[in-house]
Amino acid sequence: MTSELIFSLHTDQHIKDAVNIFGYAYGYNRITKHFNEFVYRNLKLRAVQNSPEAPIQMFYMEPEWYNQSTMTNLRSPDFKKFYDHQYKIYGTHLEATKVWPHWIDSMNAVDEIWVGNQFAKDSVLNSGVTTPTFVFEHGIDDMWKPKRRGQGDKIRFLHVDSDSPRKRADLVEKAFLELFKNNPNVEITFKHHGSERTPVFSIDQLNRRYSDGNINRIYETLSQDEMVELFYSHDILIYPSEGEGFGFIPLQALATGMPTISTGRWCSYENYLGGNVIESKLGKTEHTGYHYGEVVLADYDSLLHLMKNAVDNFEKQCDYFYAQANDVYNKYNWQNRCDQMLTDLIKRVGIKMLKPLPDFKPIPPAYLVYEGNGSYSTSDGVRFDKDKRISSVKEEISSSLLMTGLFRKATVEEIKKIDTYYSYI
């Protein structure tokens, strides 16, 4: 089987550098991986990054990236999301009922838009965007396997906030204290976003490190494996979010068979929440946040009721969610979701649009001279230092390096002096 299909993906450099720190980075990494494993009628797809060889390119990030306080563009003027000849797709996420006004012209200038759920698709259509928009439901990794809850000596709630006020850790804590304050048989862990890894601590030790009564807090950044362990060591996920671009956290909980209490509306997999959908209404966010339009506001009394009901009917909750866990995974594993999206794309545009361009000529690398002190490493592994000041980098990151003030373009004479030049020509 040969690589006879091609699909190009592109995003901002900070998304590529972040790897799995937050939603866009995690999604970009997984989409690239699983697009590379797509096969259509014995033709294997090759996922490439920002390549003019591909007739189609998806830019996976906010269409326009602005500082919301000053409304200044955070991308350099020469940054390009697509090549002119390409079929252009925006892959982006929305958490409210309206698209930012400064996104609209950009969204109307591409051929397709992919969003993570029907809620976001409706938001695009209700904002005056006329570009065809499709739902690209994301997926879950193989590591999120079922484990029946209710095996411990107490009931343990979990809330994961990723350092985002819209996930409403404040509402969860208020409800927990009202229902279970000082109850030795029930506890809760808040997994907050952190900036440091502490691998010497187990999940249980991290809980005790920041405990206050029956409330535990984790601030450290955890690996994927550690996050799975965290979910396994807790019984019920609480997630009264005001909106999600897709919603990885509740879906991961559901795939492990974890009873999950969450808001709906934004949620493509709401049917798997059973009777644990928090009642809600649309309204203005109660926190500052990256929103335009209205968001999903959880009803506090409904949250109280569902948390109490989950404890009162704990065994039934554990049985119900564990029984459906394999169905959740089978529908939402990453490869299935990516295969479906690419198959649907081929039906819309034709298989020829995923064939490499026959007259493609590779763009030569950009040669830069490092003028700083010490050393500097780029995201794709190129290292500059006092002994190797001149080297080549990918064209797509050269402009961002030139903006640092530490680099300038190499002259023809300088390029000719380095060994890599001769293999290049």
Tell where the protein language model's regions lie, with residue ranges.
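Short hydrophobic beta-strand element within catalytic cores of glycosyltransferases
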Residues: P259-S262, N276-V277
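Aromatic "clamp/platform" in nucleotide-sugar-dependent glycosyltransferases that forms part
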Residues: E242
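Extended catalytic core of nucleotide-activated donor transferases of GT-like folds
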Residues: K44-V129, E226
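Conserved donor-binding/catalytic core segment of Leloir-type glycosyltransferases
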Residues: G150-K167, E173-F176, I188-F190
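A charged, aromatic-enriched C-terminal amphipathic alpha-helix characteristic of glycosyltransferases
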Residues: R30, A298-S302, D312-T343
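Nucleotide-activated donor-binding/catalytic signature segment of Leloir-type glycosyltransferases, i.e.
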Residues: V200-D225
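N-terminal pre-catalytic "stem/leader" segment of glycosyltransferase-like enzymes
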Residues: M1-S69
